[in-house]
């Protein structure tokens, strides 16, 4: 009898041990199983996600060592011995009974696609309708809305998606309210002529930082700006929305560059109401290009606490629902191969954070985990922007222009400036002709042309690490001239970005270069021969041949030609305007990461330790070494192991 009982007990214990040993070997197994990956990729999932796929059996071989639920070596620095307060402040906002994680809909919501279709039908863009922030006040006290409304509780649409770009100075149109500058008065040169004669050059002057800076700058641009424009005008069209650029007779490479004006906000551009343009993205730096700038898109990208993914080769990517595309919160995710890589990295970062929070705070529901993860990722993007990107872009003047942070100011206009979006931040001159693909030993293994990486995700699906390392090794191009890749060969040669940038500035009513010099307390130029910021006499002579007087000079042209200031990639005028914009995005954002109460003190300390290098280590395919400072030019000699790159410890979020 005793031996029988012993045998039964032994069998039970063996079953128990084996059932415990049947584990998921990856942190995202449950999420992938819910997405149908057990059926789509059965071989890989059965090997790595037995428990999630329900393929455990007593006949399964017993692993020699217990596999851990979550990766530990390279994920988050929770092994490091850092002390956190034993009792944390309440996460419930003041005046609320609980943490509200869902924003109740109080108005009809449209997707970006639906709104764009309406704009095309009406030939004008409707602005966002202000919600009643008091209805969801406990949600708004803790989390951002998807469309940016109620960031400013006194003015709910300030900085929200689908609201007007703002201005530093009143608009300038030929007729005072609608017609492009120089369209009727002819006081400025043909944009294509300016591009060919002045701005386009195959000569590349290296900047002091690497090409990741260009890439991250584009990432930030797509986070905070999306112009309501559609390219439906051909060169044969002459309607009120069309302003195509006809090349001068001497231009042998093309006859015309199609150009469609940005949709005006409905009711503007008419006598008595100056034409204004719509920003379809949230103004705040909030990672909206990952999550979407309105609720419908956001819901389509989300599964419970996670962001939806496609598993390709055992790796996570943004949904690959159509061949050759990736679906993200912004429709321009695959505009360039490097941009698609960053979309992939920050999607992986969200899902890594969400999985860790899910394991750490099992009492949190999916909405709480999603909102906290989104808040953390948005905070990380802000940290990289203000601690790494802006100082390298603007240089020594960044601290003076932005000033010290003194907390949230609801009176600051957070909206994106027309002068920024349609002028100073159009830094296509940073783009190089070609980029290398570099292996883990920092050896070049292949090279691709920039134009071949446009709307092409093949390199991303193969190895995003090689893309990043290639960007690290190549100096960013000084933006004072544009490579012929973007003036002569982009999109099959149909687009000249220099000419388009000039025309877009005129379309958006930007004033002259001298007007913005005065705004920035810089001496306006009275003669092209007396222009210290442009020391090249040949360049000044060419400008004089194109423009009649300095007061006619386009803001974009004058700003981009300025010699970079100390430690900067930009001249003084562009540095001023871009600095003012980032100051507004910081001071006018109630959820800016340093604003007291947005994060606890331990959480804030952890966020400040994150860097772009850390993000690349956490989210690469198998990133082994990086430069400690992501924007420093790196040939491998100073690269350090990813294990030495410190970053976020999520213990500060344990409840």
Swiss-Prot record:
SS bonds (residue pairs): 22-56, 29-49, 38-53, 133-150, 520-576, 617-642
Catalytic-site annotation from UniProt: 222
A single GO molecular function term of this UniProt record: metal ion binding
EC number annotated for this UniProt entry: 1.11.1.7
Signal peptide feature range: 1-19
GO BP terms: defense response to Gram-positive bacterium; determination of adult lifespan; innate immune response; negative regulation of gene expression; response to oxidative stress
PANTHER family: OXIDASE/PEROXIDASE, PEROXIDASE SKPO-1
Annotated family: Belongs to the peroxidase family. XPO subfamily.
This protein's name: Peroxidase skpo-1
Organism: Caenorhabditis elegans
Upper lineage: Eukaryota, Metazoa, Ecdysozoa, Nematoda, Chromadorea
Chain's gene name: skpo-1
């Amino acid at each position: 009898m005793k031996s029988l009982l012993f045998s039964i007990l032994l069998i039970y214990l063996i079953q128990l041990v084996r059932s415990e040993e049947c584990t998921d070997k990856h942190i995202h197994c449950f999420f992938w199983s819910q997405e149908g990956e057990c059926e789509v990729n059965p071989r890989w999932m059965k090997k790595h996600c037995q428990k999630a796929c329900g393929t455990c059996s007593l006949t399964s071989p017993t692993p020699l060592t217990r596999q851990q639920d979550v990766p530990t070596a390279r994920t988050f620095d929770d092994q490091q011995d850092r002390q956190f307060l034993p009792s944390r402040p309440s996460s419930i906002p003041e005046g609320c009974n609980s943490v509200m994680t869902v924003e109740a809909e109080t108005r009809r919501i449209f997707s970006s696609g639906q709104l764009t279709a309406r704009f095309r039908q009406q030939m004008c863009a409707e602005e966002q309708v202000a919600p009643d922030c008091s209805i969801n006040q406990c949600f708004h006290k803790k989390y951002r809305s998807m469309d940016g409304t109620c960031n400013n509780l006194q003015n709910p649409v300030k900085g929200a998606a689908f609201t007007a770009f703002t201005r530093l100075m009143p608009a300038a149109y030929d007729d005072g309210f609608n017609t492009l500058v120089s369209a009727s008065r002819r006081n400025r040169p043909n944009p294509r002529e300016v591009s060919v004669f002045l701005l386009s050059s195959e000569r590349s002057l290296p900047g002091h930082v690497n090409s990741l800076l260009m890439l991250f700058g584009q990432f930030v641009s797509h986070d905070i700006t999306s112009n309501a424009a559609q390219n439906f005008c051909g060169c044969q069209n002459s309607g009120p929305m069309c302003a195509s650029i006809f090349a001068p007779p001497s231009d042998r490479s093309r006859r015309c560059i199609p150009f469609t004006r940005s949709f005006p906000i409905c009711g503007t551009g008419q006598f008595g109401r100056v034409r204004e343009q719509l920003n379809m993205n949230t103004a705040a730096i909030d990672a909206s290009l990952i999550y979407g700038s309105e609720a419908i898109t956001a819901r389509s990208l989300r599964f419970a606490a996670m962001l939806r993914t496609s598993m390709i080769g055992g790796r996570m990517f943004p949904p690959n629902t159509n061949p050759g595309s990736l679906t993200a919160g912004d429709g321009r995710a695959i505009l360039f191969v490097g941009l698609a890589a960053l979309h992939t990295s920050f999607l992986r970062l969200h899902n890594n954070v969400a999985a860790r929070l899910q394991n750490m705070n099992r009492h949190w529901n999916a909405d709480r985990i999603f909102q906290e993860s989104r808040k953390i990722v948005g905070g990380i993007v802000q940290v990289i922007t203000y601690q790494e990107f802006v100082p390298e872009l603007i240089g020594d003047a960044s601290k003076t222009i932005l000033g010290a942070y003194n907390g949230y100011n609801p009176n600051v206009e957070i909206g994106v400036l027309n002068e920024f979006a349609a002028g100073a931040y159009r830094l296509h001159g940073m783009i190089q002709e070609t980029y290398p693909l570099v292996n883990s030993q920092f050896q070049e293994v292949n090279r691709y042309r920039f134009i071949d990486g446009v709307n092409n995700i093949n390199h991303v699906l193969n190895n995003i690490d090689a893309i990043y390392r290639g960007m690290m090794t190549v100096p960013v191009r000084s933006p004072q001239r544009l490579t012929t890749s973007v003036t002569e060969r982009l999109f099959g040669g149909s687009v000249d970005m220099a000419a388009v940038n000039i025309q877009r500035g005129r379309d958006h009513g930007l004033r002259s270069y001298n007007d913005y010099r005065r705004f920035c307390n810089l001496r306006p130029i009275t003669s092209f021969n007396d222009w210290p910021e442009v020391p090249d006499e040949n360049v000044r002579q060419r400008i004089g041949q194109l423009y009649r007087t300095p007061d006619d000079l386009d803001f974009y042209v004058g700003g981009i030609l300025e010699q970079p200031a100390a430690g900067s990639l930009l001249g003084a005028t562009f540095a001023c305007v871009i600095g003012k914009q980032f100051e507004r995005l910081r001071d006018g954002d109630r959820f800016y990461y340093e604003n007291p109460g947005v994060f606890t003190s331990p959480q804030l300390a952890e966020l400040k330790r994150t860097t772009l290098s850390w993000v690349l280590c956490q989210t690469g395919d198998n990133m082994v070494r990086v430069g400690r400072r992501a924007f420093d030019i790196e040939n491998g000699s100073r690269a350090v192991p990813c294990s030495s790159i410190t970053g976020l410890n999520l213990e500060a979020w344990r409840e």
